[in-house]
């Protein structure tokens, strides 16, 4: 694999860093499937959610640490914290769903039984012997029932995005299934998401209404926007600013801007602190590419040495550990190696 093949575009990594809220407000996102689980990114999102929703709650025990015993999709990561309320019960928070979604990101590598065991271990690692432990297990079984019910829908609930009637039906079905399976957990798990989906669908209906003039559409869209809660409006405005910054970073990269030039330009839109972090990410990215290129060259020499598969793999693993010493780097390199091997 070349260094270029091992490259994760900086703009994509900045998007994860700077736009935590984008995935949650990106439009009518439910139509593409039952659940989209995002591995390490989900872990970062859930850490933010846990910090937000548990700010006034009792501090939960430390999360399950990264472990070599984790499934490959979770290697090098840590489970999000399960939040507790002041009485020690499981807090009704979106952060609980984030914990389960973190575990579900490994389900392609696990049987249903193994996935259940992973969740049980993760819950026990944080809540063993507490009143919140059986509560978390109960919510997990409810969430699994929700996902199983979605999977039984025709085409797993996927619909034609151009059919507004089908979109409305799909949303209604999901709301009904969530309430039936999750009960009073449906609101913390999906309430904000469902509100955004209804709002986006209402916008689509106005935009596609051929009986309205452009002026009437603008008036109705403005009236609809006034119904948006203040925190949601602020989140959308923030997302718009973040997307503009991400687009700017992509353009600067495309034009071949130097780190200093990029930092100077981004300071005007993001402020000096954020611009400095982006510049540092760019430097880190360049360092990674250089080290990965050196590693790939040495790995190729090992591949060409005619060793037994066991000796070859052992030498490559040792090389990774020597060259990638920061947390997660060796895992990232191994993942790229597997991708290169699969592509050959």
Swiss-Prot record:
<dbReference type="InterPro" id="IPR004961">
    <property type="entry name" value="Lipase_chaperone"/>
</dbReference>
<dbReference type="Pfam" id="PF03280">
    <property type="entry name" value="Lipase_chap"/>
</dbReference>
<keyword id="KW-0812">Transmembrane</keyword>
<keyword id="KW-0143">Chaperone</keyword>
<feature type="transmembrane region" description="Helical">
    <location>
        <begin position="14"/>
        <end position="34"/>
    </location>
</feature>
<dbReference type="GO" id="GO:0016042">
    <property type="term" value="P:lipid catabolic process"/>
</dbReference>
<protein>
    <recommendedName>
        <fullName>Lipase chaperone</fullName>
    </recommendedName>
</protein>
<keyword id="KW-0997">Cell inner membrane</keyword>
<keyword id="KW-0442">Lipid degradation</keyword>
<keyword id="KW-1003">Cell membrane</keyword>
<comment type="similarity">
    <text>Belongs to the lipase chaperone family.</text>
</comment>
<keyword id="KW-0443">Lipid metabolism</keyword>
<comment type="function">
    <text>May be involved in the folding of the extracellular lipase during its passage through the periplasm.</text>
</comment>
<dbReference type="GO" id="GO:0005886">
    <property type="term" value="C:plasma membrane"/>
</dbReference>
<keyword id="KW-1133">Transmembrane helix</keyword>
<dbReference type="GO" id="GO:0006457">
    <property type="term" value="P:protein folding"/>
</dbReference>
<dbReference type="GO" id="GO:0051082">
    <property type="term" value="F:unfolded protein binding"/>
</dbReference>
<keyword id="KW-0472">Membrane</keyword>
